[in-house]
Amino acid sequence: MEGAVLVSEAVDAGWHVIEQFVAPGADPISGAGAVRHLAPGVMDKIATTETPQPVLAVVERAFAGREILDTAGFVVVADGVADPGNLGTMLRSAEAAGADCVVLTPGTVDPSNPKVVRASAGAVFRVPVVEDTNLDEVGLAGIVRLGTSSHRGASHTDTDLRRRVAVVLGNEAHGLSDDANVDEWITIAHAGRSESLNVAMACTVLCFEVARQRRSGS
């Protein structure tokens, strides 16, 4: 993990930081494991970003177990989402809208991917993430699975999102298949000429509609 801000957020969220590597002239992060001071130029060689941050850390993964689904009322499901930036943005939107957890089906990009972590702006540490879980398991928890589509289903604003729901969003290129294991279909009506919204944009719209309905009671 790269960057003092993200490392600090991981510490604040209770994640276990094993050790940190600090560039010359930079201050280590308090509580972020053993400190390794690097010689000049080393950070440029080990960092993954073009403009390296002065602090890099090794962090133990701390994702949630499937049991969280038993009590969750608002779930976001990323089904085969491949782009790290999209998943990071989805995590950020889900956390901001108050989702109880984000479920990643098999084949979805790794949430510990550095690009996911950066795009999430730290949300990956704050919203529970359940990995390698399929839609059957979500349904068995008694959650209504709402498949998203560009061409079928009720409008998201006409759908009762106050229930225990899982908003299911598919792969960027293919979306959800017509025979996806969902209970209902919803769509985002829009006036533009494009066929559909980007998956991360759609996630944001839907998450905040869930939040709006739950605040207003309708």
What do these predicted regions represent?
Residues M1-E50:
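N-terminal positively charged helical leader segments and presequences
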Residues E60-A64, I68-R152:
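RNA substrate-binding interface of SAM-dependent RNA methyltransferases
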Residues A26-G33, R66-L69, V138-L140, T159, ...:
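Short loop/helix-cap segments at secondary-structure boundaries that form the rim of catalytic
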Residues A4, V22-P28, N134-L135, S150-R152, ...:
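Short, polar loop motifs at secondary-structure junctions
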Residues G3, A82-T89, S196-A202:
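Amphipathic alpha-helical repeat scaffolds
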Residues L38-P40, D79, T105-P106, P128, ...:
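Short beta->alpha connector loops at strand-helix junctions that form conserved
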Residues A57, E95-A97, T108-F125, D178-S218:
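Structured adenosyl-cofactor binding patch, chiefly the S-adenosyl-L-methionine
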Residues L146-S194:
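Active-site/ligand-binding-proximal alpha/beta "capping" segment
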